Amino acid sequence: MKIAVLPGDGIGPEIVNEAVKVLNALDEKFELEHAPVGGAGYEASGHPLPDATLALAKEADAILFGAVGDWKYDSLERALRPEQAILGLRKHLELFANFRPAICYPQLVDASPLKPELVAGLDILIVRELNGDIYFGQPRGVRAAPDGPFAGEREGFDTMRYSEPEVRRIAHVAFQAAQKRAKKLLSVDKSNVLETSQFWRDVMIDVSKEYADVELSHMYVDNAAMQLAKAPKQFDVIVTGNMFGDILSDEASMLTGSIGMLPSASLDKNNKGLYEPSHGSAPDIAGKGIANPLATILSAAMLLRYSLNRAEQADRIERAVKTVLEQGYRTGDIATPGCRQVGTAAMGDAVVAAL
C-alpha cells in the first residue's frame, strides 16, 4: 500500500514526522513517499501543488497531509498561495466528503472551555460536503452593482448552489455513517431563508426513505451553532453543506479542549482519501518542537481505517493515544496542572511506546 506523505508548511513537517514514526512502528509496512506541497511546493516549483506532487497523490492509495500556509506568502496572487494546494487536491481527486470527529477524551475534560458535565463523553461526527456551495459557485467577483439601492457602486458577489447529485451523494455517506453509530442523523441548513437550503432539505428527506433504520432530523444553522455550545452531547452525526460545515466543525473542535487533538478525512466515492489534522500550519510555533502531533497521528489512524481497510491497526493507534493521555503526557496546548508536559517528538515517542 502506497501512502503519499505531504508535510507542507509551518508545523506540518514536525507533526507529520511523528505520524510517520507511528506508522513505521506498526506490524505492517507501508510504502511512504514524500513530496512538497503548499509553500514548500511553491519554493520547489513555483506552484503550491507541483505536477509531481499531484501525480503522486493520484497514484497513492491514500494521502497523509500536514498543513499549508505562511504569512510570508500573503502577498502572492491567490492562485499561488499555499492554501490553494488543498483546494486543488480536493478538486483533482474528487474528494467530496469531509469527516471531522469531535471527541472529548475523559483525560481532557478540564481542558474544554465548557463545564465538564457538558462535554464528558462527547463524540460527534460532522460530515461536510466539500465540492459545492458558495465556495465554488459561479458567477462570483466584484463589479458595479447592476440594480438595487446602490446601483453603479462597487459590490462583491458569490453564488450559493448545489446540484441534486452533489446532495444525494453526501446524504448517502452521512446516512451510512449514522448506521454505524447511534442511527441518528441531523441535517443542518438555513431553509427558512435560502432556496439552496430548502432544496438540500428536500433531497435529504427523499434519501432518508432508503434508510429506515436512521432517524433524520433538521436544524437551522444558527440554532445548531447555539446548541453546540449549550448542549453538545445531544448530537451524534451532523451532515451539512460546505460553508456551514466549515464553521460548525471549527466550533465543535473547541468543545474538546484543543483543535490539536482532532483529525479529519476527506474521501472520494471509493474511500480513497486525504487525511490531515483539523488545525492549521501555525507558523508562529514552527520549529520550536512544541506542536501537538496527536491530531495528525489520529489522522493516520483514520487513513488506515477508511482508505486501507486496516481497522485493527487503526484501533491500535487510537488505543495508544488514549494510553498516553492516561499516563499524563501533554503538549502545551492541552497541559493541565500535574501533567507530564512534553514536546512534539517526545509525544510521538510516547505513542510508539504505547503501541
Curated annotation (Swiss-Prot):
InterPro entries, sorted: IsoCit/isopropylmalate_DH_CS, IsoPropMal-DH-like_dom, Isopropylmalate_DH
A GO cellular component entry from the record: cytosol
Protein name, per record: 3-isopropylmalate dehydrogenase
Catalytic reactions of this protein: (2R,3S)-3-isopropylmalate + NAD(+) = 4-methyl-2-oxopentanoate + CO2 + NADH
Pathway(s) this gene product operates in, as recorded in its UniProt entry: Amino-acid biosynthesis; L-leucine biosynthesis; L-leucine from 3-methyl-2-oxobutanoate: step 3/4
Keyword Magnesium on entry: yes
Family: Belongs to the isocitrate and isopropylmalate dehydrogenases family. LeuB type 1 subfamily.
Binding site for NAD(+): 280-292
HAMAP family: LeuB_type1
Free-text function comment from the UniProt entry: Catalyzes the oxidation of 3-carboxy-2-hydroxy-4-methylpentanoate (3-isopropylmalate) to 3-carboxy-4-methyl-2-oxopentanoate. The product decarboxylates to 4-methyl-2 oxopentanoate.
Pfam families: Iso_dh
Protein localization: Cytoplasm
Coiled-coil ranges (or none): none
Xref: PROSITE patterns: IDH_IMDH
Chain residues that bind Mg(2+): 222, 246, 250
